[in-house]
């Protein structure tokens, strides 16, 4: 489960139209959500509050093994009206899950606001600070968008200096002769006071570059990511048609074949150098991601390929090669596997993981948001009720029409399959009529329908090559978000359970 500060940052990126996934550091984000998920290490309680759409506070308490806490404050230039209580927040947005991100878009500038002949729209920014107790460590983040495609980050960590106490020598203690009197005493090395990290991101949609600098170790880094087959959002339909006639179809525009995958490629790399440590590093990566099908689907269209992501990473200095494969095998199950090997020492590691969405959908539990109370069947608007019934009927008809083209099962089997698809945590694909009916529904009911289509729990499991087994359960229980995890060593006979943790978050 992601922290409240990361949740605010993601919503801020979505509000300003910044590509969250178009970074080299996010190349393996899909597989990492299933193979590298974090387990609660102890009993953690977190309370978050949103007094205004631009100001947020968070209080965290770590009870075990020792009492620690923190206080956080966040403010943004963009009002984040979609962030509310834990009951109204979409559960899929507060956890790390399998997700195939859409193709990146070129960030657009803010809408111009003029007053007295001057532009007053201001600049997008986010300010975050966190005070750790009782250590009094202070960390913070400041990000702002300099241009529509250029964004700057400044992160810092400040540690208080510990007072140096001198212990007097008792009078009865004889003087020590292990050191000459004229030899100066060597003071203990003082801890590092802190660090400042500066990052500059340049995102054009097709290309993204990230330039970083760390003050503590003098490390300079460069990360790049390039998306193949990207032509931008500004290309009109006429230009696309002329380009296809002139160049022909690209590989990712070919018609799908049975059993094939239709997707896009992304390639990138990173280079970093530390002046103080005199170290140098380099790595390269490649990612293939399937492209979601364009709706509505033709009646004779083949079965769309399942959401799939493949990644390949290579570090030539240490000879480490890693490949990962993740896919959604069913509406409620996603699996991932990763194999890493060192080409110099032939040491290898294999990890297998997955997630399973469990629990009933919120609509089946009869839950509603705080802004709109639950209505009885007799008091509901008959027009809205008719639209919802027509929407469900249209979804069934669209799925049955697509199933008849790819299967020879009888009508009963198709009806059962179509009915099961309606209870998936992922919204079902609809045709043009279903889209028109969905647009006719009042915007007031749209957020409630999105919440009703999701499930309220997910179970994750991971098995590593060293026989470390991790199990994580994340769910929404009333107004709280609960995360419980356990880490076990399958080879340990005396102490197979390594750690158990519980985290509870409450948004108000």
UniProtKB/Swiss-Prot annotation:
A Gene Ontology biological process in which this protein takes part is:
phospholipid transport
Intracellular or extracellular location(s)? Mitochondrion outer membrane
Q: How does it sit in the membrane?
A: Multi-pass membrane protein
Q: Cellular component terms, GO, for this chain's entry? A: ERMES complex; SAM complex
Instruction: Describe, as the record does, how this protein assembles with itself and its partners.
Output: Component of the ER-mitochondria encounter structure (ERMES) or MDM complex, composed of MMM1, MDM10, MDM12 and MDM34. Associates with the mitochondrial outer membrane sorting assembly machinery SAM(core) complex.
| Domain notes for this protein | Lacks alpha-helical transmembrane segments, suggesting that it resides in the membrane via beta-sheet conformations similar to those predicted for other outer membrane proteins and porin.
One Pfam entry name: MDM10
The protein in question is named Mitochondrial distribution and morphology protein 10
For region Disordered, the annotated ranges are 160-195
Q: Does the keyword Cytoplasm apply?
A: no
Entry superkingdom: Eukaryota
Its keywords, alphabetically, are: Membrane, Mitochondrion, Mitochondrion outer membrane, Transmembrane, Transmembrane beta strand
- Which InterPro entries does this chain map to? Mdm10
Species annotation: Cryptococcus neoformans var. neoformans serotype D (strain B-3501A)
User: What's the stated role of this polypeptide?
Assistant: Component of the ERMES/MDM complex, which serves as a molecular tether to connect the endoplasmic reticulum and mitochondria. Components of this complex are involved in the control of mitochondrial shape and protein biogenesis and may function in phospholipid exchange. MDM10 is involved in the late assembly steps of the general translocase of the mitochondrial outer membrane (TOM complex). Functions in the TOM40-specific route of the assembly of outer membrane beta-barrel proteins, including the association of TOM40 with the receptor TOM22 and small TOM proteins.
Q: Record's family?
A: Belongs to the MDM10 family.
């Amino acid at each position: 489960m992601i922290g409240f500060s990361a949740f605010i940052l993601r919503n801020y990126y979505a509000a300003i139209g910044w590509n969250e996934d178009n970074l080299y550091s996010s190349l393996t984000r899909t597989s990492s959500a299933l193979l590298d998920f974090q387990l609660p290490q102890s009993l953690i309680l977190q309370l978050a509050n949103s007094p205004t759409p631009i100001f947020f506070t968070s209080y965290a308490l770590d009870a075990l093994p020792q009492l620690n806490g923190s206080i956080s404050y966040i403010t943004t230039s963009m009002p984040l009206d979609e962030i509310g209580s834990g009951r109204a927040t979409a559960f899929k947005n507060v956890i790390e899950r399998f997700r195939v991100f859409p193709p990146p878009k070129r960030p657009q500038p803010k809408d111009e606001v003029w007053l007295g002949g001057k532009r007053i729209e201001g600049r997008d920014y986010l300010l975050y600070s966190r005070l750790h107790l009782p250590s009094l460590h202070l960390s913070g983040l400041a990000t702002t968008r300099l241009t529509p495609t250029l964004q700057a980050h400044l992160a810092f960590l400040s540690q208080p200096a510990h007072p140096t106490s001198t212990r007097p020598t008792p009078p009865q203690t004889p003087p020590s002769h292990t050191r000459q009197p004229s030899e100066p005493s060597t003071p203990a090395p003082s801890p590092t006071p802190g660090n400042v990290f500066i990052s500059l991101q340049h995102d054009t949609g097709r290309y993204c570059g990230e330039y970083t600098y760390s003050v503590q170790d003098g490390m300079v880094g460069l990360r790049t990511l390039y998306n193949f087959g990207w032509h931008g959002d500004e290309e009109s339909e006429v230009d696309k048609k002329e380009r296809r006639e002139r160049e022909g179809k690209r590989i990712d525009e070919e018609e799908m074949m049975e059993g094939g995958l239709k997707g896009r490629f992304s390639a990138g790399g990173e280079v970093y150098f530390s002046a103080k440590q005199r170290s140098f590093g380099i790595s390269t990566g490649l990612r293939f991601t399937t492209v979601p099908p364009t709706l509505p689907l033709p009646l004779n269209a083949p079965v769309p390929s399942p959401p799939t992501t493949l990644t390949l990473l290579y570090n030539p200095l240490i000879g480490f090669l890693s490949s990962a494969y993740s896919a959604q095998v069913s509406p409620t199950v996603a699996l991932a596997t990763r194999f890493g090997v060192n080409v110099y020492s032939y040491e290898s590691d294999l990890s297998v993981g997955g997630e399973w969405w469990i629990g009933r959908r919120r609509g089946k539990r009869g839950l509603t948001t705080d802004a709109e109370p639950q209505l009885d069947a007799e008091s509901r608007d008959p027009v809205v009720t008719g639209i919802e019934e027509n929407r469900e009927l249209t979804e069934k008809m669209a799925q049955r029409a697509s199933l008849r083209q790819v299967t020879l099962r009888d009508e009963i089997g198709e009806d059962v399959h179509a009915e099961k698809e309606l209870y998936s945590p992922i919204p079902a694909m609809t045709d043009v009529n279903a889209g028109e009916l969905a647009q006719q529904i009042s915007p007031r009911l749209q957020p409630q329908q999105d919440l009703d289509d999701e499930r309220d729990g997910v179970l994750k499991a991971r098995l590593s090559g060293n026989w470390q087994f991790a199990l994580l359960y994340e769910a929404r229980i009333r107004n709280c978000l609960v995360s419980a995890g356990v880490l076990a060593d399958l080879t340990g006979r005396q102490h197979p359970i390594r750690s158990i943790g519980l985290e509870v978050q409450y948004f108000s």
